[in-house]
Amino acid sequence: MGRLRLPLVILVAVAAAGAATFLLRPRSGLIDPAPVDVEAYFTAFQLDRAEDYRSVQRLLGIGGLVVSTGTLALLAWRPPRGLFERLGRRPLLGAAAAGAGISVLLVMVGLPIDAWQRSRALDVGLATQSWPDWALDVVKSTAVGAGVAAVGGLLALVLVRRFRRNWWAPAAVVIVAFGVITIWLWPVVIDPIFNDFEKLPPGPVRQDVLGLADEAGVDVGEVYRVDASRRTTAANAYVGGLGHSKRVVLYDNLIAGFPRDEVRLVVAHELGHQKHNDLSRGLLWLALVAPAGTFFAQRLAEAFGRRYGLGDPAVKPGPIVLPAVALAVTLASLLLGSASNVLSRQVEARADAFALDLTQDPAAFVQFERRIALRNVIDPEPPWLTRFLFATHPTTMERIGIGEAWEKPE
């Protein structure tokens, strides 16, 4: 693996992510947002409230990322040798235990920040769930995460031991397969652990969904209502699943709290994702980037775990190398994720344009974007750096600009 220096490997991975984003970008159906004045849509009080809330939440989120990454770095640098020696007596079972244990540890070290963020969400009225119910959700999500991490730890050690110098190649295949399985099974296996889903009953909303789907020529799969209101006052909708698990999911507080014409626009936006196969587009991006990304992760992992035999063809590594692998995968994902977010913002903007074309209702579109920003306490114009690094959707003002541009084309 010494053939390529690490800086060159990083450059190749970043180039692969950028090339995949460029290749898969929407080539039509986008609308350049019209210039709009934020003060024409939001009062000074509303802007200050959103900034006060979101600025601290962003800092807490970044702090949580630093804490979790720092914890992995500490584990990779100074792993508890006695514990890992015991796990190494039965390497594969030990790897599963190590994966689960690392996952639980990361939840625990991040819990104070998560609780702080939730406390602030309660203060602004976004969170509705009691603390005991929230704690139960933490236990559930920790258990699910530990199970997934156990499988991940087991597979990682199998690949590292079997393909000592080139485990990045089969790892790329595993990551893509995991992405497909996750999108396919998560809506029917994991989501029901946390929420109750019911098929949207006959009525105006279901009629609108099916009518819009027919007009758009989209196989909508099934339409579900989820009891999101038991956790939050925020409203949302999303598409998920593949094949028989394909679905459109509407928050119950979206259906109950917004006018019918605005709900139609949200539905039309989600149909735009299905019309353009955006979930499959995301999987294709992953497939294109995974080889370079896992090669980058392997080089990082070998740098972190060399003293424990990682990268040495004469050594069969044990579970003690897993913190180094986890840290490397985390850093690679953070570096390459911004390119994925660029693509996500583009397909979201195209889905907005699709919704406007389908409903022909720009006034309702603009009103919805304003209303959802107020309800979800969204900063209409967040700082450009956090937007570039983390945002998966256009900003509120960009989306309002799309609506205004559609209504008044040049």
Per-segment meaning from a language model:
Residues 3-9, 21-316, 330-410:
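Polar-ligand-bearing catalytic/cofactor-coordination segments
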Residues 316-326:
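N-terminal signal-anchor/signal peptide hydrophobic helix marking the start
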